[in-house]
Amino acid sequence: MTGARTDHLREQVEAWIGRPMSTSGPAVAPDAVNLPMIRHWVDALDDRNPVYLDEAFAATTRFGGVVAPPAMLQTWTMARPQIDGIAARGGAAGEIPADSPLGLLNAGGFTGTLATNSELEFARYLRLGDRLQSATALESVSECKATALGLGYFVTWVSTYTDDGQAVVGRQRFRIYKFEPRNDVSATSGGRGRAPSVEPGVGEELAPFDLDVSSTVVVAGAIASRDFMPAHHDRAFATGQGAPDVFMNILTTNGYVSRYVTDWAGPEAMLRTISVRLGAPAVPGYVLRFTGRVVGERREGSERVIEVGIRAANDLGDHVTGTVVLTLPSANAAS
């Protein structure tokens, strides 16, 4: 591949910066926020926070009723999948327009897709009956990079989620690596190397949590989050993309990060942000250990704002590092 070709392709993709990535308008959630989907999620991730399903308990909390797990934000507007041909589309739910940013990269041979970063912001927790829309705009595309997975581009977009009243309920900045798959790759780190450790701070350490990652854990999380990308359930497809096996999707990873922190902080905790960087894949046969430490704390009126540095690692390296910011009513603050 020549430099001229690379630059020309990047210029084509860059022309989309600041523009909606879909010409058909915002994505509309197929369903309103509902208990069955919440139940599927919490069962798949074994998240027993009572504010997600126990209406009587939730009514006594700051939320006043059942709310959806915050890490489900992206799940609600995931498109209904067209299963036929999904592998050829790299896991995309439907046909990707040829002149779209991802369509241009696919046509250029960069058909591999790997999520690398996610920053979630929550303006409020979602309630039963909320019907979401999401508008997604391209933010940036990197120069062509060489990684263990092959040549490719880091592509970043921002999705803004609104409710029926057009009020913003959350945002996500999402980065993926679009690459030319190589058949000779034996990937152990997802092409990103070891993610940087969270800067340690003085404060309480969260008790470690060990997740025995199995194929069932990987597939259950993908289905509960409505992610039908073959790399999360089809081993042959995953290894063809350079992964050692099927691997956990980023929605599931965010879900486990949310569970880990709220298991410690309690059901009155409200997450404001989940910001993570992915490194080594979470794959069957490797126990994933979550650890955390309080790295910041301040008061805002009657609430404590707490920042927790988190890390989840297996024998392949750091799967995810990042921070979670949450609030707690002062009387309920974990300490």
Task: Outline where the language-model segments fall.
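Short, intrinsically disordered/low-complexity patches at protein termini
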Residues: 92, 152, 156-157, 230-232, ...
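HotDog/MaoC-like acyl-thioester-processing domains
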Residues: 1-26, 115-209, 282-335
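Short flexible/disordered coil segments
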Residues: 88-89, 93, 127, 275, ...
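Catalytic-pocket segment enriched in acidic/His residues
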Residues: 245, 252-297
